[in-house]
Structures are given as structure tokens and as C-alpha cells.
Amino acid sequence: MDYEIKQEKKRTIAGFHLVGPWEKTVKQGFDQLMMWVENHNIEPLEWVAVYYDNPDEVPAEKLRCDTVVTVPENFCLPENSEGVNVTEIAGGQYAVTVARVQGHDFGTPWYQFINSLLEDSQYQMAHKPCFEVYLNNGAVDGYWDIEMYVPVLPK
């Protein structure tokens, strides 16, 4: 899988932190996030899922993720936003690629991307969260186009 190494700025994010099998928690988190965004007239810059764990090493019931939107740096959390966290995704060097996800199979492009990175002779994965940015509304289109970001360090 082809990818680029990019220098990314930090992103301020607002949304929900969930623990459990990603195939359940990510959908649940985005359902909550959509309601919060609509109810508070939030204007998201991006829709993002942040992944904190390696599913090959961490049991499914302990997998952590955030379902979030990027917001301006000076974002103030509105009243009645229980459960919503405002934090940031660190800036730095990331390997970045784009993939189309069909049939809710987000795992395959991630495994392909990670396997390509493991073969890289110049960069290695950093022990920081990975994330994906949604480029379209898959619930409407029937597929998702996503940008995948993996933090990297020179070898």
C-alpha cells in the first residue's frame, strides 16, 4: 500500500472515549457524537476515530477508541455535554494513506497499511495513537473513504 510521510499539526478534538470491541464501540460512539453535534449546532472540521491499542495484543473488551470531531483550538464545550471530552491529537510525523472501506471492513485496509509500514526501511511506527479521518458519509454513500494516520519515527 502506498503512503506518504507528512508533518501534521496537532488537532483539537471533542467527542467520546469508549472501551470495548471496536466493531461495536465505534458505531455507538459515532451515533452519540452525531446526536451531540446536531443538538449543539457544532460545526465539525473533520470526523475522526482515534485508536489507542493494537487489536492483536489487547483483548477486544479492553480496546480503547475515541469518536470525535476536530474543532477550533479555542473551542468551548457547550452546556449539557455530559460525557464529551475535549483533548488533542499530537502533531508530528505521520504515515498517511487513503482507502475505501466497503462492507464495514475497516480492518483490512488497516492491516494492509500496517504491514506496508513494517517493511519501511526509513521509518518505524511510534507508540502513539493512530487515527482515521472520514472523507464522506458512509451511511449515505454505502462506503467510506478514509485517510489513515500512523505516527512514525525515523529508524
UniProtKB/Swiss-Prot annotation:
Q: Which Pfam families match?
A: GyrI-like (PF06445)
Q: Which UniProt keywords apply?
A: Cytoplasm, Stress response
HAMAP family referenced in this protein's UniProt entry, alphabetically? DNA_gyrase_inhibitor (MF_01896)
Entry keyword Cytoplasm: yes
Entry's InterPro entries?
Answer: AraC_E-bd, DNA_gyrase_inhibitor, DNA_gyrase_inhibitor_GyrI, GyrI-like, Reg_factor_effector_dom_sf
- The name under which this protein is listed is DNA gyrase inhibitor
Instruction: Indicate the segments annotated as coiled coil, or none if absent.
Output: none
Please tell me whether the keyword Cytoplasm is annotated for this protein.
yes
Family affiliation: Belongs to the DNA gyrase inhibitor family.
Describe its partners and assembly state. Interacts with DNA gyrase.
Q: Can you provide one Gene Ontology molecular function annotated for this UniProt record?
A: DNA topoisomerase type II (double strand cut, ATP-hydrolyzing) inhibitor activity
Q: Identify one Gene Ontology CC term for this UniProt entry.
A: cytoplasm
State the compartments where it is located: Cytoplasm
Q: Briefly, what is this protein's role?
A: Inhibits the supercoiling activity of DNA gyrase. Acts by inhibiting DNA gyrase at an early step, prior to (or at the step of) binding of DNA by the gyrase. It protects cells against toxins that target DNA gyrase, by inhibiting activity of these toxins and reducing the formation of lethal double-strand breaks in the cell.
